[in-house]
Amino acid sequence: MTNEYLAPFVDELFNLGVREAVFSPGSRSTALAMLFEEYKKYDTYVNIDERSAAFFALGIAKAKKRPVVLVCTSGSAAAHHFPAVLEAKMSRVPLIILTADRPAELQFVGAPQTVDQTRFFGNFVNHFENLEAPHIQKQSQTENFWTYPRKVAQRAVLSAISPLSGPVQINVPLRDLLVPELKSENYEKGRSKHAFKFYEGQAQVILPFDEALLSGKTLILAGANFDKDYSEALLKLAEQLKAPILADPLSNLRNHNHPLVIDSYDAFLANNDLKTQLKADAILLFGQMPVSKRLQQFVAFNNEAEFIQVDPALDYRNPSLTTTTMVQSDVLPFASSIKKVNSDSSYLEKWQNAQEKMRQLLEKVTYEESPFEGRYVQELQKHLEALDAQLLVSNSMEIRDIDYWWKKADAKVRILGNRGVNGIDGTESTALGIATTGKPTVLLTGDLSMLHDLNGLIVGKTHELNLTIVLFNNDGGGIFHHLAQKGVPNFDYLFSTPHGLNFAGLAELTGLDYHLVSGYADFGQQFEASLHQSGIHLLEIKTDKDLSLALHQKYTTYEN
Protein backbone atom coordinates (compact mmCIF):
# COMPACT_ATOMS: atom_id res chain seq x y z
CA MET A 1 0.00 0.00 0.00
CA THR A 2 2.98 2.29 -0.65
CA ASN A 3 1.15 4.90 -2.70
CA GLU A 4 -2.37 3.57 -3.20
CA TYR A 5 -3.72 6.30 -0.91
CA LEU A 6 -3.05 8.83 -3.68
CA ALA A 7 -5.86 7.42 -5.84
CA PRO A 8 -8.63 8.80 -3.57
CA PHE A 9 -6.77 12.13 -3.54
CA VAL A 10 -6.92 12.25 -7.35
CA ASP A 11 -10.60 11.25 -7.30
CA GLU A 12 -11.54 13.87 -4.71
CA LEU A 13 -9.88 16.69 -6.63
CA PHE A 14 -12.00 15.78 -9.65
CA ASN A 15 -15.15 15.60 -7.52
CA LEU A 16 -14.41 19.15 -6.38
CA GLY A 17 -14.20 20.54 -9.89
CA VAL A 18 -10.54 20.22 -10.88
CA ARG A 19 -10.31 19.17 -14.53
CA GLU A 20 -6.74 19.81 -15.70
CA ALA A 21 -3.34 18.50 -14.58
CA VAL A 22 0.05 19.63 -15.90
CA PHE A 23 3.17 17.47 -15.39
CA SER A 24 6.87 17.74 -15.90
CA PRO A 25 8.66 14.39 -16.19
CA GLY A 26 10.43 13.04 -13.11
CA SER A 27 11.02 9.85 -11.17
CA ARG A 28 9.77 10.82 -7.71
CA SER A 29 6.48 12.13 -9.14
CA THR A 30 5.80 8.90 -11.06
CA ALA A 31 2.83 7.81 -8.96
CA LEU A 32 1.13 11.21 -9.18
CA ALA A 33 1.49 11.49 -12.96
CA MET A 34 0.36 7.92 -13.61
CA LEU A 35 -2.66 8.11 -11.29
CA PHE A 36 -3.91 11.35 -12.83
CA GLU A 37 -3.47 9.93 -16.34
CA GLU A 38 -5.06 6.58 -15.51
CA TYR A 39 -8.11 8.30 -14.04
CA LYS A 40 -9.11 9.04 -17.65
CA LYS A 41 -11.26 12.08 -16.81
CA TYR A 42 -8.62 14.80 -16.57
CA ASP A 43 -7.24 16.84 -19.42
CA THR A 44 -3.52 16.22 -18.89
CA TYR A 45 -0.55 18.09 -20.33
CA VAL A 46 3.19 17.35 -20.24
CA ASN A 47 5.84 20.06 -20.43
CA ILE A 48 9.52 19.17 -20.05
CA ASP A 49 10.44 22.54 -18.51
CA GLU A 50 9.00 23.17 -15.03
CA ARG A 51 9.03 26.95 -15.39
CA SER A 52 7.11 26.80 -18.64
CA ALA A 53 4.79 24.13 -17.22
CA ALA A 54 3.90 26.36 -14.29
CA PHE A 55 3.03 29.34 -16.48
CA PHE A 56 1.10 27.03 -18.81
CA ALA A 57 -0.98 25.83 -15.84
CA LEU A 58 -1.41 29.44 -14.76
CA GLY A 59 -2.83 30.28 -18.16
CA ILE A 60 -5.36 27.44 -17.98
CA ALA A 61 -6.48 28.47 -14.50
CA LYS A 62 -6.70 32.12 -15.47
CA ALA A 63 -8.81 31.38 -18.55
CA LYS A 64 -11.07 28.72 -17.05
CA LYS A 65 -11.32 30.31 -13.58
CA ARG A 66 -10.86 27.10 -11.66
CA PRO A 67 -7.96 25.35 -9.88
CA VAL A 68 -5.41 23.52 -12.02
CA VAL A 69 -3.05 20.83 -10.71
CA LEU A 70 0.68 21.27 -11.34
CA VAL A 71 2.97 18.28 -10.63
CA CYS A 72 6.75 18.21 -10.36
CA THR A 73 9.44 15.87 -9.07
CA SER A 74 11.68 16.48 -6.04
CA GLY A 75 14.77 18.67 -5.76
CA SER A 76 15.25 21.81 -7.82
CA ALA A 77 12.11 21.23 -9.91
CA ALA A 78 9.86 23.21 -7.57
CA ALA A 79 12.24 26.17 -7.70
CA HIS A 80 11.39 26.59 -11.37
CA HIS A 81 7.72 26.97 -10.41
CA PHE A 82 8.46 29.99 -8.24
CA PRO A 83 7.92 32.78 -10.81
CA ALA A 84 4.50 31.40 -11.76
CA VAL A 85 3.61 30.90 -8.09
CA LEU A 86 4.41 34.56 -7.42
CA GLU A 87 2.24 35.59 -10.34
CA ALA A 88 -0.61 33.33 -9.20
CA LYS A 89 -0.46 34.79 -5.70
CA MET A 90 -0.42 38.41 -6.81
CA SER A 91 -3.05 37.98 -9.53
CA ARG A 92 -5.22 35.62 -7.44
CA VAL A 93 -5.17 32.61 -9.73
CA PRO A 94 -5.94 29.18 -8.21
CA LEU A 95 -3.13 26.64 -8.62
CA ILE A 96 -2.62 23.38 -6.71
CA ILE A 97 1.10 22.56 -6.81
CA LEU A 98 1.95 18.95 -5.96
CA THR A 99 5.66 18.75 -5.16
CA ALA A 100 6.83 15.14 -5.00
CA ASP A 101 9.46 14.69 -2.30
CA ARG A 102 11.83 12.20 -0.73
CA PRO A 103 10.56 10.60 2.53
CA ALA A 104 11.78 11.75 5.95
CA GLU A 105 14.55 9.15 6.22
CA LEU A 106 16.21 10.51 3.06
CA GLN A 107 16.19 14.14 4.18
CA PHE A 108 19.48 15.78 5.29
CA VAL A 109 21.58 12.69 4.52
CA GLY A 110 22.88 13.65 1.08
CA ALA A 111 20.26 11.79 -0.95
CA PRO A 112 20.14 12.98 -4.59
CA GLN A 113 17.48 15.40 -5.77
CA THR A 114 16.58 16.23 -2.18
CA VAL A 115 16.09 19.65 -0.63
CA ASP A 116 13.88 20.82 2.21
CA GLN A 117 10.54 21.38 0.45
CA THR A 118 8.58 22.29 3.59
CA ARG A 119 6.76 25.57 2.94
CA PHE A 120 8.94 25.89 -0.14
CA PHE A 121 7.05 28.89 -1.51
CA GLY A 122 6.88 30.68 1.85
CA ASN A 123 4.15 33.31 2.17
CA PHE A 124 3.33 33.16 -1.52
CA VAL A 125 0.82 30.32 -1.15
CA ASN A 126 -2.59 30.36 0.50
CA HIS A 127 -1.97 27.02 2.17
CA PHE A 128 0.76 24.43 2.68
CA GLU A 129 0.34 20.83 3.76
CA ASN A 130 2.26 17.57 3.67
CA LEU A 131 0.35 14.63 2.21
CA GLU A 132 2.06 11.81 4.05
CA ALA A 133 1.33 8.10 3.74
CA PRO A 134 -1.30 7.46 6.44
CA HIS A 135 -0.09 5.19 9.23
CA ILE A 136 -2.28 2.21 10.11
CA GLN A 137 -1.75 0.44 13.43
CA LYS A 138 -4.93 -1.59 13.55
CA GLN A 139 -7.79 -2.65 11.31
CA SER A 140 -10.16 0.01 12.67
CA GLN A 141 -7.88 2.70 11.22
CA THR A 142 -8.00 1.37 7.65
CA GLU A 143 -10.81 3.76 6.70
CA ASN A 144 -8.59 6.76 7.51
CA PHE A 145 -6.04 5.46 4.99
CA TRP A 146 -8.55 6.33 2.28
CA THR A 147 -10.38 9.23 3.98
CA TYR A 148 -7.38 11.33 5.00
CA PRO A 149 -6.12 12.06 1.43
CA ARG A 150 -9.64 13.18 0.49
CA LYS A 151 -9.59 15.71 3.31
CA VAL A 152 -6.23 17.02 2.09
CA ALA A 153 -7.75 17.45 -1.38
CA GLN A 154 -10.72 19.30 0.10
CA ARG A 155 -8.48 21.69 2.00
CA ALA A 156 -6.36 22.22 -1.11
CA VAL A 157 -9.29 23.22 -3.31
CA LEU A 158 -10.95 25.29 -0.60
CA SER A 159 -7.71 27.18 0.08
CA ALA A 160 -7.07 27.74 -3.64
CA ILE A 161 -10.37 29.56 -4.12
CA SER A 162 -11.32 31.04 -0.74
CA PRO A 163 -11.31 33.65 0.63
CA LEU A 164 -9.09 34.88 -2.22
CA SER A 165 -7.94 32.64 -5.05
CA GLY A 166 -4.27 31.75 -5.15
CA PRO A 167 -1.68 28.96 -5.20
CA VAL A 168 -1.53 26.05 -2.74
CA GLN A 169 1.42 23.70 -2.15
CA ILE A 170 0.82 20.07 -1.23
CA ASN A 171 4.15 18.37 -0.60
CA VAL A 172 4.02 14.61 -1.23
CA PRO A 173 6.86 12.53 0.27
CA LEU A 174 6.98 9.18 -1.56
CA ARG A 175 8.91 6.01 -0.89
CA ASP A 176 9.92 3.30 -3.32
CA LEU A 177 8.24 1.53 -5.07
CA LEU A 178 7.43 4.62 -7.09
CA VAL A 179 5.33 2.94 -9.80
CA PRO A 180 1.79 2.62 -8.42
CA GLU A 181 -0.56 -0.33 -8.68
CA LEU A 182 -3.23 0.96 -11.03
CA LYS A 183 -6.34 -0.49 -9.43
CA SER A 184 -9.44 1.32 -10.61
CA GLU A 185 -11.30 0.44 -7.41
CA ASN A 186 -8.84 2.46 -5.34
CA TYR A 187 -10.17 5.71 -6.78
CA GLU A 188 -13.52 5.08 -5.11
CA LYS A 189 -12.23 4.15 -1.66
CA GLY A 190 -12.95 6.53 1.17
CA ARG A 191 -15.79 8.25 -0.66
CA SER A 192 -18.35 9.70 1.71
CA LYS A 193 -22.05 8.97 1.38
CA HIS A 194 -22.38 12.75 0.97
CA ALA A 195 -20.30 14.66 -1.58
CA PHE A 196 -18.16 17.39 -0.03
CA LYS A 197 -19.65 20.88 -0.41
CA PHE A 198 -18.73 24.32 0.82
CA TYR A 199 -20.62 27.58 0.77
CA GLU A 200 -19.01 31.00 0.98
CA GLY A 201 -20.89 33.86 2.55
CA GLN A 202 -24.31 33.60 4.12
CA ALA A 203 -26.87 33.63 1.33
CA GLN A 204 -27.14 29.91 0.55
CA VAL A 205 -26.73 28.30 3.93
CA ILE A 206 -30.09 26.53 3.84
CA LEU A 207 -29.72 24.89 0.43
CA PRO A 208 -27.78 21.69 1.08
CA PHE A 209 -29.45 20.77 4.34
CA ASP A 210 -33.19 20.42 3.80
CA GLU A 211 -33.37 16.66 3.42
CA ALA A 212 -31.09 15.86 6.34
CA LEU A 213 -32.71 18.35 8.67
CA LEU A 214 -36.22 17.20 7.82
CA SER A 215 -35.31 13.63 8.75
CA GLY A 216 -35.60 14.56 12.39
CA LYS A 217 -32.29 12.98 13.41
CA THR A 218 -30.27 16.15 13.62
CA LEU A 219 -27.67 16.73 16.31
CA ILE A 220 -26.07 20.07 17.23
CA LEU A 221 -22.55 20.23 18.69
CA ALA A 222 -21.79 23.49 20.49
CA GLY A 223 -18.09 24.21 20.92
CA ALA A 224 -16.37 26.95 22.89
CA ASN A 225 -17.88 30.42 22.61
CA PHE A 226 -18.36 33.13 25.20
CA ASP A 227 -20.92 35.38 23.47
CA LYS A 228 -24.51 35.63 24.66
CA ASP A 229 -25.74 35.89 21.05
CA TYR A 230 -24.16 32.49 20.32
CA SER A 231 -26.20 30.75 23.01
CA GLU A 232 -29.44 32.44 22.03
CA ALA A 233 -28.98 31.67 18.32
CA LEU A 234 -28.25 27.99 18.95
CA LEU A 235 -31.22 27.62 21.29
CA LYS A 236 -33.44 29.17 18.64
CA LEU A 237 -32.07 26.82 15.98
CA ALA A 238 -32.50 23.78 18.23
CA GLU A 239 -36.10 24.74 18.93
CA GLN A 240 -36.81 25.03 15.21
CA LEU A 241 -35.31 21.61 14.53
CA LYS A 242 -36.31 19.90 17.77
CA ALA A 243 -32.67 18.88 17.93
CA PRO A 244 -30.53 18.16 20.99
CA ILE A 245 -27.55 20.45 21.64
CA LEU A 246 -24.50 18.71 23.05
CA ALA A 247 -23.09 21.62 25.01
CA ASP A 248 -19.37 21.79 25.69
CA PRO A 249 -18.83 23.53 29.04
CA LEU A 250 -16.98 26.34 27.26
CA SER A 251 -19.99 26.95 25.00
CA ASN A 252 -21.71 28.43 28.08
CA LEU A 253 -24.97 26.86 26.93
CA ARG A 254 -25.01 24.99 30.21
CA ASN A 255 -26.07 28.33 31.69
CA HIS A 256 -29.52 27.47 30.36
CA ASN A 257 -31.64 24.82 32.04
CA HIS A 258 -33.26 24.17 28.68
CA PRO A 259 -34.73 20.77 27.71
CA LEU A 260 -32.77 20.75 24.43
CA VAL A 261 -29.39 21.30 26.11
CA ILE A 262 -27.62 18.00 26.82
CA ASP A 263 -24.81 17.61 29.34
CA SER A 264 -23.09 14.49 30.79
CA TYR A 265 -22.84 12.95 27.31
CA ASP A 266 -19.18 12.02 27.74
CA ALA A 267 -20.28 9.47 30.33
CA PHE A 268 -23.19 7.81 28.55
CA LEU A 269 -21.53 7.76 25.12
CA ALA A 270 -19.23 5.09 26.54
CA ASN A 271 -22.17 2.69 26.21
CA ASN A 272 -21.93 1.02 22.78
CA ASP A 273 -25.59 -0.04 22.60
CA LEU A 274 -26.73 3.48 23.35
CA LYS A 275 -24.25 4.92 20.85
CA THR A 276 -25.92 2.92 18.09
CA GLN A 277 -29.38 4.14 19.09
CA LEU A 278 -28.21 7.76 19.05
CA LYS A 279 -26.75 7.79 15.52
CA ALA A 280 -27.78 10.91 13.60
CA ASP A 281 -28.56 11.70 9.97
CA ALA A 282 -27.09 15.20 10.24
CA ILE A 283 -24.59 16.71 12.67
CA LEU A 284 -24.07 20.46 12.91
CA LEU A 285 -20.83 21.72 14.46
CA PHE A 286 -20.48 25.30 15.69
CA GLY A 287 -17.09 26.44 16.95
CA GLN A 288 -14.29 24.01 17.68
CA MET A 289 -14.95 20.37 18.48
CA PRO A 290 -16.02 19.93 22.13
CA VAL A 291 -13.45 18.62 24.59
CA SER A 292 -15.10 15.21 25.07
CA LYS A 293 -13.02 12.43 23.51
CA ARG A 294 -16.01 10.07 23.56
CA LEU A 295 -18.01 12.61 21.58
CA GLN A 296 -15.25 12.74 18.97
CA GLN A 297 -15.30 8.94 18.84
CA PHE A 298 -19.08 9.06 18.43
CA VAL A 299 -18.70 11.43 15.47
CA ALA A 300 -16.23 9.03 13.84
CA PHE A 301 -18.60 6.13 14.56
CA ASN A 302 -21.41 8.16 12.99
CA ASN A 303 -19.43 8.58 9.75
CA GLU A 304 -22.38 8.23 7.36
CA ALA A 305 -24.09 11.33 8.71
CA GLU A 306 -24.08 14.63 6.87
CA PHE A 307 -21.53 16.54 8.96
CA ILE A 308 -22.07 20.28 8.53
CA GLN A 309 -19.46 22.62 9.94
CA VAL A 310 -20.54 26.24 10.31
CA ASP A 311 -17.61 28.61 10.73
CA PRO A 312 -17.02 32.22 9.62
CA ALA A 313 -13.43 31.40 8.63
CA LEU A 314 -14.05 28.01 6.98
CA ASP A 315 -11.46 26.42 9.26
CA TYR A 316 -11.42 22.63 9.56
CA ARG A 317 -12.29 21.72 13.15
CA ASN A 318 -13.21 18.06 12.95
CA PRO A 319 -10.36 15.64 13.71
CA SER A 320 -12.69 12.72 12.98
CA LEU A 321 -12.27 13.46 9.23
CA THR A 322 -16.04 13.21 8.64
CA THR A 323 -16.89 16.77 7.54
CA THR A 324 -19.05 16.72 4.40
CA THR A 325 -20.20 20.34 4.19
CA MET A 326 -18.58 23.60 5.26
CA VAL A 327 -20.58 26.80 5.54
CA GLN A 328 -18.94 30.20 5.89
CA SER A 329 -21.30 31.90 8.28
CA ASP A 330 -21.65 33.15 11.81
CA VAL A 331 -24.16 31.37 14.00
CA LEU A 332 -26.87 34.01 13.94
CA PRO A 333 -27.39 34.34 10.15
CA PHE A 334 -27.20 30.58 9.75
CA ALA A 335 -29.76 29.96 12.47
CA SER A 336 -32.02 32.66 11.05
CA SER A 337 -31.94 31.05 7.61
CA ILE A 338 -33.33 27.73 8.84
CA LYS A 339 -37.10 27.54 8.67
CA LYS A 340 -39.20 25.74 11.23
CA VAL A 341 -39.68 22.08 10.35
CA ASN A 342 -41.99 19.34 11.53
CA SER A 343 -39.63 16.72 12.85
CA ASP A 344 -40.00 13.49 14.75
CA SER A 345 -39.34 14.08 18.43
CA SER A 346 -38.33 10.49 19.21
CA TYR A 347 -34.65 11.13 18.43
CA LEU A 348 -34.52 14.06 20.83
CA GLU A 349 -36.25 11.97 23.50
CA LYS A 350 -33.53 9.31 23.29
CA TRP A 351 -30.90 11.91 24.16
CA GLN A 352 -33.04 13.40 26.92
CA ASN A 353 -33.73 9.98 28.45
CA ALA A 354 -30.04 9.06 28.40
CA GLN A 355 -29.15 12.37 30.02
CA GLU A 356 -31.76 11.94 32.75
CA LYS A 357 -30.58 8.45 33.60
CA MET A 358 -26.97 9.64 33.67
CA ARG A 359 -27.89 12.68 35.76
CA GLN A 360 -29.44 10.48 38.46
CA LEU A 361 -26.17 8.58 38.73
CA LEU A 362 -23.96 11.67 38.69
CA GLU A 363 -25.98 13.38 41.41
CA LYS A 364 -25.20 10.56 43.84
CA VAL A 365 -21.76 12.13 44.17
CA THR A 366 -23.31 14.76 46.46
CA TYR A 367 -23.23 12.11 49.20
CA GLU A 368 -19.56 11.29 48.66
CA GLU A 369 -17.50 12.10 51.76
CA SER A 370 -14.05 11.29 50.36
CA PRO A 371 -12.14 14.19 48.75
CA PHE A 372 -13.17 13.88 45.11
CA GLU A 373 -12.90 16.37 42.25
CA GLY A 374 -16.38 15.49 40.98
CA ARG A 375 -18.14 16.61 44.12
CA TYR A 376 -15.92 19.67 44.48
CA VAL A 377 -16.91 20.76 40.96
CA GLN A 378 -20.57 20.47 41.95
CA GLU A 379 -19.88 22.48 45.12
CA LEU A 380 -18.06 25.11 43.04
CA GLN A 381 -21.02 25.37 40.67
CA LYS A 382 -23.44 25.75 43.58
CA HIS A 383 -21.52 28.76 44.88
CA LEU A 384 -20.92 30.37 41.47
CA GLU A 385 -24.07 29.94 39.40
CA ALA A 386 -25.94 32.89 40.91
CA LEU A 387 -23.01 35.27 40.41
CA ASP A 388 -22.03 37.38 37.42
CA ALA A 389 -18.60 35.78 37.65
CA GLN A 390 -15.87 34.35 35.44
CA LEU A 391 -14.37 30.87 35.79
CA LEU A 392 -11.17 29.96 33.95
CA VAL A 393 -10.57 26.22 33.80
CA SER A 394 -7.09 24.84 33.19
CA ASN A 395 -6.42 22.08 30.68
CA SER A 396 -5.58 18.44 31.31
CA MET A 397 -7.92 16.91 33.92
CA GLU A 398 -9.71 20.01 35.20
CA ILE A 399 -11.57 20.81 31.95
CA ARG A 400 -12.65 17.18 31.82
CA ASP A 401 -13.87 17.34 35.42
CA ILE A 402 -15.98 20.34 34.44
CA ASP A 403 -17.24 18.50 31.36
CA TYR A 404 -18.40 15.59 33.50
CA TRP A 405 -19.75 17.29 36.59
CA TRP A 406 -20.90 20.81 35.63
CA LYS A 407 -24.60 20.38 34.90
CA LYS A 408 -26.92 22.70 33.04
CA ALA A 409 -28.68 25.29 35.21
CA ASP A 410 -29.95 28.82 34.79
CA ALA A 411 -26.85 30.80 35.68
CA LYS A 412 -24.73 33.83 34.81
CA VAL A 413 -21.18 32.55 35.31
CA ARG A 414 -19.00 32.50 32.18
CA ILE A 415 -16.68 29.52 31.80
CA LEU A 416 -13.48 30.14 29.84
CA GLY A 417 -10.48 28.05 28.84
CA ASN A 418 -7.40 28.02 26.61
CA ARG A 419 -8.51 25.29 24.20
CA GLY A 420 -6.70 26.58 21.11
CA VAL A 421 -3.70 24.31 21.60
CA ASN A 422 -4.81 22.81 24.95
CA GLY A 423 -1.57 23.46 26.83
CA ILE A 424 -1.13 23.78 30.60
CA ASP A 425 1.10 26.84 30.32
CA GLY A 426 0.17 30.40 31.28
CA THR A 427 -2.89 29.48 33.34
CA GLU A 428 -2.47 31.94 36.22
CA SER A 429 -1.46 34.73 33.82
CA THR A 430 -4.58 34.18 31.71
CA ALA A 431 -6.78 34.18 34.82
CA LEU A 432 -5.27 37.44 36.04
CA GLY A 433 -5.77 38.98 32.61
CA ILE A 434 -9.44 38.00 32.84
CA ALA A 435 -9.59 39.48 36.36
CA THR A 436 -8.80 42.96 34.98
CA THR A 437 -12.50 43.19 34.03
CA GLY A 438 -13.25 43.72 37.72
CA LYS A 439 -15.79 40.90 37.88
CA PRO A 440 -15.39 38.09 40.43
CA THR A 441 -12.85 35.74 38.86
CA VAL A 442 -12.05 32.14 39.78
CA LEU A 443 -9.35 29.81 38.45
CA LEU A 444 -9.84 26.04 38.70
CA THR A 445 -6.46 24.43 38.13
CA GLY A 446 -4.32 21.38 38.84
CA ASP A 447 -0.99 21.24 40.60
CA LEU A 448 1.17 20.81 37.47
CA SER A 449 -0.60 23.66 35.68
CA MET A 450 -0.16 25.83 38.76
CA LEU A 451 3.55 25.07 38.99
CA HIS A 452 3.98 25.82 35.30
CA ASP A 453 3.09 29.51 35.69
CA LEU A 454 4.07 30.60 39.20
CA ASN A 455 5.86 33.63 37.73
CA GLY A 456 2.52 34.77 36.36
CA LEU A 457 1.32 35.56 39.88
CA ILE A 458 3.69 38.52 40.10
CA VAL A 459 1.50 40.71 37.88
CA GLY A 460 -1.45 40.09 40.17
CA LYS A 461 0.42 41.47 43.15
CA THR A 462 1.86 44.38 41.16
CA HIS A 463 -1.54 45.52 39.90
CA GLU A 464 -3.58 44.51 42.98
CA LEU A 465 -5.89 42.15 41.10
CA ASN A 466 -8.48 39.93 42.75
CA LEU A 467 -8.55 36.19 42.04
CA THR A 468 -9.65 33.01 43.80
CA ILE A 469 -7.62 29.93 42.82
CA VAL A 470 -9.18 26.53 43.49
CA LEU A 471 -6.32 24.03 43.29
CA PHE A 472 -6.80 20.28 42.85
CA ASN A 473 -3.51 18.85 44.09
CA ASN A 474 -3.10 15.13 43.39
CA ASP A 475 0.70 15.37 43.42
CA GLY A 476 1.35 14.97 39.71
CA GLY A 477 -0.27 14.20 36.38
CA GLY A 478 -3.57 12.58 37.35
CA ILE A 479 -4.91 12.56 33.81
CA PHE A 480 -2.53 9.73 32.91
CA HIS A 481 -4.39 7.45 35.32
CA HIS A 482 -7.31 7.71 32.87
CA LEU A 483 -5.21 7.04 29.76
CA ALA A 484 -3.43 4.13 28.11
CA GLN A 485 -0.16 4.96 29.88
CA LYS A 486 -1.59 3.75 33.21
CA GLY A 487 0.37 0.71 34.36
CA VAL A 488 3.27 0.93 31.90
CA PRO A 489 6.83 0.45 33.21
CA ASN A 490 8.18 3.52 35.03
CA PHE A 491 4.67 5.03 35.06
CA ASP A 492 5.23 7.29 38.07
CA TYR A 493 8.62 8.51 36.88
CA LEU A 494 7.61 9.22 33.26
CA PHE A 495 3.95 10.22 33.51
CA SER A 496 2.48 10.58 37.00
CA THR A 497 5.50 12.70 38.06
CA PRO A 498 4.86 13.13 41.80
CA HIS A 499 6.62 16.29 42.99
CA GLY A 500 5.86 16.45 46.73
CA LEU A 501 5.96 20.24 46.75
CA ASN A 502 4.40 22.30 49.54
CA PHE A 503 1.90 24.80 48.16
CA ALA A 504 1.67 26.56 51.52
CA GLY A 505 5.32 27.46 51.12
CA LEU A 506 4.80 28.49 47.50
CA ALA A 507 1.88 30.67 48.57
CA GLU A 508 4.06 32.38 51.16
CA LEU A 509 6.77 32.90 48.56
CA THR A 510 4.35 34.53 46.10
CA GLY A 511 2.32 36.44 48.69
CA LEU A 512 -0.97 34.57 48.30
CA ASP A 513 -3.62 34.18 50.96
CA TYR A 514 -3.53 30.39 51.50
CA HIS A 515 -5.95 27.85 52.95
CA LEU A 516 -5.79 24.04 52.95
CA VAL A 517 -9.38 22.82 52.52
CA SER A 518 -10.42 20.25 55.14
CA GLY A 519 -13.75 19.19 53.63
CA TYR A 520 -16.76 20.21 51.58
CA ALA A 521 -18.32 22.49 54.21
CA ASP A 522 -14.98 24.16 54.83
CA PHE A 523 -14.55 24.69 51.09
CA GLY A 524 -17.90 26.47 50.83
CA GLN A 525 -17.11 28.81 53.70
CA GLN A 526 -13.62 29.65 52.51
CA PHE A 527 -14.68 30.07 48.89
CA GLU A 528 -17.50 32.48 49.75
CA ALA A 529 -15.18 34.47 51.99
CA SER A 530 -12.53 34.76 49.26
CA LEU A 531 -14.99 36.33 46.85
CA HIS A 532 -15.60 39.19 49.27
CA GLN A 533 -11.95 39.92 49.99
CA SER A 534 -9.32 41.61 47.88
CA GLY A 535 -6.13 39.97 46.67
CA ILE A 536 -5.26 36.50 45.41
CA HIS A 537 -6.57 33.56 47.42
CA LEU A 538 -5.40 29.97 47.05
CA LEU A 539 -7.70 27.16 48.23
CA GLU A 540 -5.80 23.88 48.05
CA ILE A 541 -7.77 20.63 47.84
CA LYS A 542 -5.67 17.50 48.21
CA THR A 543 -6.91 14.42 46.35
CA ASP A 544 -5.58 10.96 45.60
CA LYS A 545 -5.13 9.90 41.97
CA ASP A 546 -6.08 6.24 42.44
CA LEU A 547 -9.09 7.03 44.63
CA SER A 548 -10.26 9.67 42.16
CA LEU A 549 -10.06 7.17 39.30
CA ALA A 550 -12.09 4.61 41.27
CA LEU A 551 -14.74 7.17 42.23
CA HIS A 552 -14.87 8.50 38.68
CA GLN A 553 -15.62 5.00 37.39
CA LYS A 554 -18.15 4.42 40.17
CA TYR A 555 -20.22 7.48 39.37
CA THR A 556 -19.94 7.60 35.57
CA THR A 557 -20.59 4.03 34.39
CA TYR A 558 -23.82 4.04 32.37
CA GLU A 559 -25.58 0.68 32.23
CA ASN A 560 -28.46 -0.40 30.02
Swiss-Prot record:
Superkingdom of the source species: Bacteria
Cofactor detail note: Binds 1 thiamine pyrophosphate per subunit.
EC number: 2.2.1.9
Cofactors that this protein relies on: Mg(2+); Mn(2+); thiamine diphosphate
GO terms classed as biological process: menaquinone biosynthetic process
GO function terms (MF aspect): 2-succinyl-5-enolpyruvyl-6-hydroxy-3-cyclohexene-1-carboxylic-acid synthase activity; magnesium ion binding; manganese ion binding; thiamine pyrophosphate binding
Reactions the enzyme catalyzes: isochorismate + 2-oxoglutarate + H(+) = 5-enolpyruvoyl-6-hydroxy-2-succinyl-cyclohex-3-ene-1-carboxylate + CO2
Bilayer-spanning residue ranges: none
InterPro entries noted in UniProt: DHS-like_NAD/FAD-binding_dom, MenaQ_synth_MenD, MenD_middle, THDP-binding, Thiamin_PyroP_enz_TPP-bd_dom, TPP_enzyme_TPP-bd
Family that this chain belongs to: Belongs to the TPP enzyme family. MenD subfamily.
Free-text function comment from the UniProt entry: Catalyzes the thiamine diphosphate-dependent decarboxylation of 2-oxoglutarate and the subsequent addition of the resulting succinic semialdehyde-thiamine pyrophosphate anion to isochorismate to yield 2-succinyl-5-enolpyruvyl-6-hydroxy-3-cyclohexene-1-carboxylate (SEPHCHC).
The protein's name in its UniProt record: 2-succinyl-5-enolpyruvyl-6-hydroxy-3-cyclohexene-1-carboxylate synthase
